Amino acid sequence: MELNKLKLTELVPLISKGEVRPHEIIIDVFKRVQEVEGKVKAYITLTVEKAYDMAREAENAIFSGKKSLLTGIPIAVKDNICTKGILTTCASKILYNFYPPYESTVTSKLLNNKYILIGKTNMDEFAMGSSTENSGFHVTKNPWDLERVPGGSSGGSAAAVAADECIAALGSDTGGSIRQPASFCGVVGLKPTYGRVSRFGLVAFASSLDQIGPITKCVADAALLMNVISGHDPMDSTSAPIESSDFTEYLGKEVKGIKIGIPKEYFIEGMDKEVEERIKDAIKELESLGCIPVEISLPHTEYAVATYYIIATSEASSNLARYDGVKYGLRVQGKDLLEMYMKTRSRGFGTEVKRRIMLGTYSLSAGYYEAYYKKAQQVRTLIKNDFEKAFEKVDFIVTPTAPSPAFKIGEKIDDPLQMYLSDIFTISVNLAGVPAISLPCGFSEKGLPVGLQIIGKPFDEAGILQLAYAYEQSTPWHKMKPLL
């Protein structure tokens, strides 16, 4: 048995019964990493020695009767989530030597469970991108087709899960950065409600949009990981005062009579025909399970991309002002303080990060604040209202995750607008702060995965997981693996 190929929900009972030891699992995981990492390049940092130490700690906990839910489970963590004493770069040269002096809340919760950290995964620099081509270190490849992108910005996490280089992973989602890579790599990605999972220790991109979530091999694994990472955190002022619940309780429950909204604005010209066909097939499958499709309208969808790129870049220009070479990270010497700031930021940040800082600074400038930033916030409210009105009629909203399957490496990197439009179906969810999941719903003729997005009401992750699980169990797509 190749233990690295098992799901989280398969390994947990095996560890509990003593049939499998954590040490054995990580041997298989690192064997797989050795086989395929040279092709996939999912990781920035592999924590091999640390992983074996953690495996010993996990085994000691098991033998002393102190096993927790995720004890002995190898998990990969996106490289913008702080791990104390372990290199955390955000895939940026400006943080090439940053070892956080503290632990993020989500990894603290995993540590309390005695998990095993496999490594820190590659990403678009500071989570700005949709392809993982903007990494300051290397480009991650899609395990289904090594000439294509894995999506972004959590491309390393999604690729690692798809390639069985870990059992599960954590990502972050600001405008689709968990869901779009999950769609491209044929895995499951959940973006929780804003405030459901603590952001303490997540390196900020856009503070009103960022959210940490799981990337897993199946829906039940996502539910299990959510049990551990969700819940109120006093260290995060935006954390919702809602404690974690058992999300696995809802798996397998009846979905008959559930109303699913189909927004007409999400079936647009320019969308890949095969994606449209797979989504329509998925809607028929949900109908056969007893769900009731209802056509709805989210009328301000057409403004979502513009709204997002004003708000997100404005917040980024403020958040990234702290990287100046003084306290940590890259420092390039200059003849005075101002020159040091300029040289450090010029050499440390990549092209896309510089572009977004400039755009955000422009939007916040005195002459344009009213015309851009303030107006974008007003449109954001309209988008949020669209969802509230829709959820008066339906229980969930079903859409494509992305307008196309994974595109070729280099295909969109020189065309920012085309790259930005690849998040057109995911961005509104972040602007509204609602939860959404992406799960596999078929393949293109070229064998590339297609993702189905299910959007729920605020804090109804349990309902999303219930519906996603029902669909997943009635289809074979989650069982498909890339041939690497």
From Swiss-Prot:
Superkingdom assignment: Bacteria
Keyword Ubl conjugation (UniProt): no
Catalytic residues (positions): 78 (charge relay system), 153 (charge relay system), 177 (acyl-ester intermediate)
Enzyme class: ligase
EC number: 6.3.5.7
Keywords, sorted A to Z: ATP-binding, Ligase, Nucleotide-binding, Protein biosynthesis
Gene Ontology MF: a single term: ATP binding
GO CC annotations on file: glutamyl-tRNA(Gln) amidotransferase complex
One Pfam family named in its UniProt record: Amidase
GO annotation (BP), single: translation
Family annotation (InterPro entries): Amidase (IPR000120), Amidase_CS (IPR020556), Amidase_dom (IPR023631), AS_sf (IPR036928), GatA (IPR004412)
Reactions it catalyzes: L-glutamyl-tRNA(Gln) + L-glutamine + ATP + H2O = L-glutaminyl-tRNA(Gln) + L-glutamate + ADP + phosphate + H(+)
Function: Allows the formation of correctly charged Gln-tRNA(Gln) through the transamidation of misacylated Glu-tRNA(Gln) in organisms which lack glutaminyl-tRNA synthetase. The reaction takes place in the presence of glutamine and ATP through an activated gamma-phospho-Glu-tRNA(Gln).
NCBIfam families to which the protein is assigned, alphabetical: gatA (TIGR00132)
HAMAP family hit by this protein: GatA
Oligomer status and interactors: Heterotrimer of A, B and C subunits.
Family recorded in the similarity comment: Belongs to the amidase family. GatA subfamily.
Name of the protein in its database record: Glutamyl-tRNA(Gln) amidotransferase subunit A
Lineage: Bacteria, Pseudomonadati, Nitrospirota, Thermodesulfovibrionia, Thermodesulfovibrionales
